[in-house]
Design a protein with these regions (language model features):
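Alpha-helical transmembrane segments and immediately membrane-proximal extracytoplasmic
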Residues: 1-502, 506-507, 511-512, 516-528, ...
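Tandem CBS (Bateman) regulatory domains
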Residues: 480-514, 526-530, 546-602, 607-640
């Protein structure tokens, strides 16, 4: 008797447990949709706890690695010692590489939220639960060592992996797995900002692109639970997150005469988002292009070192500023890490009015300071993340928007057109975010929840929509979808596309496929087609490797010249350009292939065989079967 390997035996036990559990729930009359509601509470609570753990891990690395090294080497206080500053984030980059190698995972072409979007759009939410642990440590190393990145995207990925773990454990169907991932992602964003509604909209507008009631309910529950859990663990009072608004926020008052100014602000923020996106893409393309010349595992460290050079530039430019000199002595560089403390100063009116003084010097945020940190933040973030660092662009986008908006506010205030530049910094913060991630609704509601003031709505709506349109016209994609576009993956919107993304080929009825060999004559294929009524054939070699398709259109062409059929071989006329579809691919991927190659059938291959075996041919997927299943799913969504 052959012994079953322990790992396979464990998988069999888990599968058997799932099947027994599903059967028992069915006996009790508990549907998976009902179970999803209950599970959303658990996902939200665990994601809220994971957010707190992530925050503490970042602080731990910052307090026991970055600050001791910065202070002991005088890297932020003395000119000759500035050269040591880039080495500190570079060390974090090397630690990141070692962690990934230890974990057995290398940076793929799609990571972070781009990887999560790909999983949702092409794999029905298929996500490894271990990705959460890998992301927690990797992003903590990047941000805690001074890398310019935000915690929001990592926390969203961690939350999604928690949802994936729960769904996989209970054997959830592909229909509901994306919703669980959305629950986790919404929970993470909610906990970061203490903004449950923004978390819900982020998951539905950016990730799922699905606003159906069936999707909304569990995501709302997870978002609220995560915010509640984080507040409980952090000891906060009201619903506050990692990012907390200043107690003296800008005086929000809107008049019709300010419309042109906010449209101008939106245009500036849109151009900033375009510049940020294009430079990020430039660095990423350069890194990928030079993989062979520079060992790829060194790229995160080199990028982190370059972000450190940006910090050195800031030290040199502002070393005579009394306030910044004090902050530099504490090891703080405004463009490093998430930049939250600097964002809070930029949206606080007191930092524009000369209320603060240090050693007899009045402290004001100047136009020079805002412009410089805006440019340096774009550079530092691109150098940190594009070569392989782990983190998000959410916080950098807020930082860039606050700096750009504050600069616009100062210029307008100089000419007596406005009285409070901090308001423009606040609105600019949301406008750049809306443009960079192409999610204006999320940005609008996020600012409303942060300020808890309805007066912000019209200004941010004007600026966010203007900025988003400019980004759409000049770039056409967000920072999250650009990597997908490079791989030929297009994301749709609304319920229809969502339905295609959550249904797998494995849920459809396949037709039996007839196999032809490349050395078969076309006359023999025509005879088989006439005898059996077959229209399409899968062309495979003798070892079972897929080579292409022979379609009815190819046969019709031969029928016009039947005397040539005995002289032609299948391999000479087959469609070698048509790839097969995998058994666990989504209908979205299948529909894309149907449209791209203009065919009515696709060969379906098994994708669960060991790597050393040839994938088995399972049958044909027809376009008509796909559309029939799609209409059924769409009708179900609209009636929920």
């Amino acid at each position: 008797m052959r012994l079953i390997p322990p790992i396979n035996q464990l998988k069999q036990w888990i599968l058997a447990w799932q099947l027994r559990g599903q059967q028992q729930l069915a006996r009790w009359g508990i549907r998976e949709q009902t179970l999803l509601i209950g599970l959303s509470f658990i996902v939200g609570l665990v994601a809220g706890g994971a957010t707190w753990l992530f925050e503490q891990t970042v602080k731990l690395i910052e307090n026991y690695y970055y600050l001791p090294l910065a202070n002991s080497t005088h890297a932020t206080t003395r000119w000759p010692c500035y050269v040591f500053l880039p080495l500190i984030p570079a060390g974090g980059g090397l630690a990141l590489v070692l962690w990934r190698r230890l974990w057995g995972r290398q940076k793929s072409e799609l990571h972070g939220l781009a990887g999560l979007l790909h999983s949702l759009s092409r794999e029905s939410g298929k996500l490894k639960a271990s990705l959460g642990i890998e992301t927690l440590v990797a992003s903590s190393l990047t941000i805690g060592s001074g890398g310019s990145a935000g915690p929001e995207a990592p926390i969203a990925v961690i939350g999604a992996s928690i949802g994936a773990l729960c769904g996989n454990t209970l054997g959830f169907s592909r229909r509901n797995m994306p919703i669980l991932l959305g629950c986790g992602a919404a929970a993470g964003i909610s906990a970061v900002f203490g903004a449950p509604i923004a978390g819900v909209l982020f998951a539905m507008e950016v990730l799922l692109r699905d606003f159906s009631v069936r999707t909304l309910t569990p995501i709302v529950i997870s978002s609220v639970m995560a915010s509640t859990m984080y507040v409980g663990l952090s000891g906060g009072g009201a619903a506050r997150g990692i990012f907390q608004m200043p107690t003296n926020g800008p005086a929000l008052a809107f008049t019709f005469g300010q419309v042109p100014y906010y449209l101008l602000l939106g245009a500036v923020c849109g151009l900033l988002a375009v510049g940020f996106t294009r430079f990020y893409l430039l660095v990423e393309n350069y890194s990928q292009k030079h993989r062979s010349r520079i060992p790829y595992f060194l790229h995160p460290a080199i990028g982190a070192a370059l972000s450190g050079v940006c910090g050195v530039a800031m030290l040199i430019i502002f070393r005579d500023d009394p306030f910044l000199h004090t902050r530099f002595a504490q090891g703080y560089i405004p463009i490093f890490s998430d930049g939250y403390p600097t964002i809070l100063r930029m949206i606080d009116p007191r930092w524009y009015s000369g209320v603060h003084t240090i050693a007899g010097h009045t402290i004001n945020l100047t136009l020079e300071f805002l412009v410089v940190i805006c440019v340096l933040k774009i550079l530092a973030t691109s150098f940190t993340l594009a070569p392989g660092g782990s983190g998000g662009v959410f916080a950098p986008a807020l930082f860039i928007g606050a700096a750009g908006g504050g600069a616009v506010g100062l210029v307008l205030a100089h000419y007596g057109l406005v009285s409070d530049p901090a308001t423009y910094a606040l609105v600019g913060m949301g406008a750049v975010l809306a443009a960079a991630i192409q999610a204006p609704l999320t940005a609008i509601i996020l600012l409303f929840e942060l300020t808890q003031n309805y007066a912000i709505m019209v200004p941010i709506m004007l600026a966010a929509v203007t900025a988003t349109v400019i980004q759409q016209l000049l770039v056409g994609e967000s920072l999250y979808t650009l990597p997908l576009k490079k791989l030929g993956v297009k994301l749709g919107a609304a319920v229809g596309i969502s339905a295609l993304q959550r249904i797998g080929v494995d849920q459809l009825v396949l037709l039996k496929a007839q196999v032809a060999r490349p050395d078969d004559s076309l006359s023999s294929i025509l005879a088989r087609s006439h005898l059996d009524g077959e229209e399409d054939f899968v062309v495979m070699d003798k070892t079972g490797n897929y080579l292409g398709l022979l379609t009815i259109d190819d046969l019709k062409t031969v029928l016009l010249e039947p005397e040539a059929a005995p002289l032609l071989l299948v391999g000479e006329v087959m469609r070698a350009d048509v790839p097969p579809i995998k058994f666990h691919d989504t209908l979205d991927a299948a529909l894309t292939m149907f449209g791209r190659f203009d065919i009515s059938r696709l060969a379906v291959l098994d994708d669960v065989n060991p790597a050393d075996k040839t994938p088995a041919l399972l049958g044909f997927l027809t376009r008509s079967e796909l559309m029939k299943r799609y209409q059924q799913e769409l009708a179900g969504d609209l009636t929920v």
